[in-house]
């Protein structure tokens, strides 16, 4: 987590070389970074508009070391988060009230199952077998395709060969070069989805302009307005490299 509000100008002994300290949860111009969502999500919601939903990962395999998906966290003050792959429901996640972030009013939610109920629907597995197979695939996703002894034991129990596991991994999780999936995250509050984030390949780019103080007042000092510009995709997601 960041330890101060915003980045700031500093002396030459910082490693960035531009005399700016980048410790803030916002940048010099008060544009929020990802860590700002951690703090924003600690607010107790009183209306749907108070719900925060920020997904840590862009879900773009080519943007990750070795194309390995790694961890995905959601920063939210919702009661739970539903994950969809395309139009298929995958799983619903709730905050871990006993985990390492249990002291927070609204702990970040780790999205650690990207297979969920899909194996029952598309592979014809029974519920118990689907849970074990999904555990294998999610572990491979987390551990860069390195099966643990437990996963190998599960494969033997399910009579799954390595080629069977690879086929399902390519289909339900994916690797570099495979068709990219659309993921939809829904924040659930009082039993209904009140905010949505969609992650999919970028199809269009537009420039968003937000004026934070639209009325300037003529007075004894100069008034000014903060204007923020962001490059966003078709779903309103920030494009950080533009």
Where are these regions (language model features)?
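Extracellular Ig-like/FN3 beta-sandwich strand-entry sites
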Residues: 178-182, 222-224
């Amino acid at each position: 987590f960041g330890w101060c509000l915003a980045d700031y100008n500093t002396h030459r002994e910082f490693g960035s070389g531009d005399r700016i300290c980048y410790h803030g949860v916002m940048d010099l111009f008060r544009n929020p970074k990802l860590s700002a969502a951690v703090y924003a999500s600690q607010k107790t919601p009183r209306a749907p508009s108070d719900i925060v939903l920020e997904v840590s990962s862009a879900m773009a395999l080519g943007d990750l070391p070795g194309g390995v998906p790694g961890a995905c966290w959601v920063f939210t003050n919702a009661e739970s988060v539903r994950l969809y792959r395309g139009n298929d429901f995958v799983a619903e996640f709730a905050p871990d009230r006993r985990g390492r972030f249990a002291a927070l009013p609204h702990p970040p939610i780790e999205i650690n199952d990207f297979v969920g109920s899909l194996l029952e629907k598309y592979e014809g597995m029974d519920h118990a077998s689907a849970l074990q197979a999904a555990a294998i695939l999610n572990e491979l996703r987390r551990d860069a395709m390195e099966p643990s002894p437990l996963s190998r034991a599960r494969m033997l129990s399910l009579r799954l060969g390595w080629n069977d596991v690879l086929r399902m991994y390519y289909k339900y999780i994916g690797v570099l070069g495979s068709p990219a999936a659309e993921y939809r995250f829904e924040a659930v509050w009082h039993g209904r989805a009140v905010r949505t984030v969609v992650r999919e390949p970028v199809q269009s780019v537009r420039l968003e302009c937000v004026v934070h103080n639209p009325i300037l007042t003529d007075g004894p000092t100069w008034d000014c307005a903060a204007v923020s510009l962001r490059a966003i995709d078709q779903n309103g997601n920030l494009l950080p490299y533009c």
